[in-house]
């Protein structure tokens, strides 16, 4: 599926090269961002993979060798830097489209993954210049189905439950036999403090057993017309990620734990937790563990956890 997306981006980029069309820069920027998104996910899951920036036939695609680490890094950083230059500051009326902040945010994630925190810090500072985006007052508000594509959402899959354009009940609490396949475990729940208001997003409903906690982050109201669909969106990049990656970049680049904790505390205090100080977190190793736990609490079931643990060496 990822290579299908890459093929489509390459196809559009090949055909629009030199064309005189309206919104040329925006469309090119979107393709560069999406191609980078898919290549980055391939890299994080499989390591170096075959890459191409042009359309190739299926027969020729089989002949492309795996790239090197340097080639993957160059492709991602060049394309995302160009995408950030081309994309507008806001998506306009079509809110599901990406703006330049998406390119800067993904670029920062690439830099952190490749062990370049200073470059990530610079990219995130560019992202934060876009004042159209910011933290919502609570994590729950980010996922309110009546508050879709809010100011915290940077890049999300847009769903609409009408006409079967939702995502079923996969991420909504239900009683189907496989419901617990994506529910939190007791071990994961243990990283939350009891007064953390994000806990309600993974444990809102009555426990039906001592080992089951129901995920309600993507809750949508029941609709008798669309009984098998949920219309809530799925965010892949949101402003809380900008904040916590900036904390990571500060710590890893040697800017000081006090400055890093100042940014980590932004999501903690939003969740109703006390601020951490350098008396609580005394080393870079302790900070990495605290950051991993905070990212786990903030981004539960949003597809970050494994990648975070790998990147942080935990």
Language-model features: where?
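Conserved, well-structured interaction surfaces
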Residues: 1-46, 63, 67-71, 80-95, ...
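Short, surface-exposed recognition loops and adjoining beta-strand edges that mediate ligand/DNA contacts
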Residues: 49-53, 87-171, 274-290
């Amino acid at each position: 599926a990822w290579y299908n997306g890459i093929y489509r981006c390459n196809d559009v980029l090949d055909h629009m090269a030199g064309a005189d069309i309206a919104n040329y820069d925006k469309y090119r920027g979107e393709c560069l961002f999406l191609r980078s998104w898919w290549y980055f996910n391939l890299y994080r899951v499989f390591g170096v993979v075959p890459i191409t920036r042009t359309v190739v036939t299926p027969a020729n695609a089989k002949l492309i060798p795996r790239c090197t680490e340097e080639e993957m890094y160059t492709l991602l950083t060049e394309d995302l830097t160009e995408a950030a230059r081309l994309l507008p500051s806001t998506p306009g009326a079509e809110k599901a489209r990406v703006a330049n902040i998406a390119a800067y945010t993904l670029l920062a994630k690439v830099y952190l993954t490749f062990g370049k925190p200073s470059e990530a810090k610079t990219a995130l500072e560019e992202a934060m210049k876009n004042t159209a985006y910011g933290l919502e007052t609570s994590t729950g508000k980010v996922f309110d189905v009546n508050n879709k594509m809010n100011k915290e959402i940077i890049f999300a899959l847009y769903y609409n439950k009408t006409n079967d354009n939702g995502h079923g009940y996969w991420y909504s609490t239900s009683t189907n036999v496989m419901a617990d396949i994506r529910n939190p475990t007791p071990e994961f729940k243990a990283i939350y403090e009891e007064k953390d208001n994000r806990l309600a997003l993974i444990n809102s409903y009555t426990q039906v057993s001592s080992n089951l906690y129901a995920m309600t982050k993507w809750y949508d109201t029941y609709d008798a017309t669309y009984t098998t669909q949920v219309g809530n969106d799925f965010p892949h990049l949101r402003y809380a990620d900008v904040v916590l990656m900036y904390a990571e970049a500060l710590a890893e680049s040697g800017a000081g734990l006090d400055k890093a904790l100042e940014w980590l505390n932004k999501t903690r205090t939003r969740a109703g937790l006390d601020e951490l100080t350098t008396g609580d977190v005394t080393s870079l190793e302790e900070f990495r563990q605290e950051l991993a736990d905070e990212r786990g609490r903030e981004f539960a079931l949003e597809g970050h956890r494994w990648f975070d643990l790998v990147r942080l060496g935990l």
